[in-house]
Amino acid sequence: MKHISASQLVMLLTIYIYSENAGFLISPIIKTASYNAVLAVILGGVLGLLIVLAGAAVARMNEREYFAVFGKYIVGKWVHIPLILLLAGYMLHRASMSMRNVEDFLMVNHLPTTPETVIAILLGLTVALTVRSGIQAIARMAEVIFFVNLLLLIILTPLLLGIELQTPMLRAFVTNFDLNRTAAGTLQATPWFGDAFVVLFIYPHLKQQIKIRRVAVWGAVFSMILILSYLVPSLLAFGPELAGKMTYPVMEYVRSMRIADFIETLDPFLTILYIPALMLKISLLVYAAVISLARILSLHDYKPLAFSVSAAVVGYSVHFADNTAELLYFMTAYWPSYALCMQLIPILYWFVAKIRGKGAAHPKAP
């Protein structure tokens, strides 16, 4: 079994957490939390990290086996199978939502005349091939994407800081505290980070000497910094009212800058940051779902499921919502509660295992 190192996992978690959130969920959280969005992201990051650590604690109970296999020893086979199907369904639902975000983004900004179905099929083919390549390929992709993102951010940050920002607004982050808005924003941000509980499903691929708590903390911290690096400038450039009504406030912020006559806009560079990172996230979600389904079906090789499951994700993404506004409303109003319910399921296993005592995650000796 090929293993993932600690540094690879940090990069993978960083890209996985920040990619979609920085690109598409900035506007919803600004609309919800206003100036309290920064605090909401920080609190959400801490709570989401606790969810991830709970999932990792369950995975450590049987480090050599997949959660889809050893979970039945904890709660029983007929309880475990419906729960693992729920979790696999959630991950595929999440992958479909992310893919729909990519489709809408490309259609609005770069491919307005291309049929959505064509874009979805091409994205699905990319995901299927990535999933078939295995977790090691996904981890190596994360390394490349991480350093490309880091390089572009280093290059673009000085240029973007040249845009006039309303720096007096910084005081509002402290003076405009609202408990209700902060709580609502925290509820919305927590599943952003809690989504990294996917590590539970790939734990056997991690090197055994990895200190998972330290890795998860660094992944959450790095992704939090990256998300805030998009969120704060968007707030200072447009204010909470206007930024909350924009579909892609970060894109509008970048478009407001011109560099002489040879680069009219920097938004293609932003696309370079978004799309590969999001495809990595979708691929990891599909991989985790496929590997779990393969174990439930007692398949020795998960690869035959890669194309069929990816095709299902493509079909669902096309019919996920009628338009971008409806998609944003779903992500703001309904998805956080649904996501938290799914992400908290591993905690049920943790409680049952603690009650049953040591060895609960291993088969009983005959």
Sequence positions of predicted segments:
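Membrane-water interface regions at transmembrane-helix termini and the short interhelical loops
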Residues: 31, 107, 124-145, 205-209, ...
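Selective recognition of specific alpha-helical transmembrane segments in multi-pass small-molecule
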Residues: 42-54, 87-95, 127-128, 148-163, ...
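Hydrophobic, membrane-embedded alpha-helices of multi-pass small-molecule transporters
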Residues: 6-24, 40, 44, 87-91, ...
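Membrane helical hairpin/interfacial module
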Residues: 22-116, 125
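Membrane-interface interhelical connector segments
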Residues: 237-267
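Hydrophobic alpha-helical segments and their helix-loop junctions in multi-pass secondary transporters
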Residues: 92-95, 99, 131, 148-174, ...
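Membrane-interface loop-to-helix entry segments
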Residues: 102, 117, 130-160, 335-342
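Membrane-interface "cap" regions at the ends of multi-pass membrane proteins
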Residues: 1-27, 33-35, 205-206, 351, ...
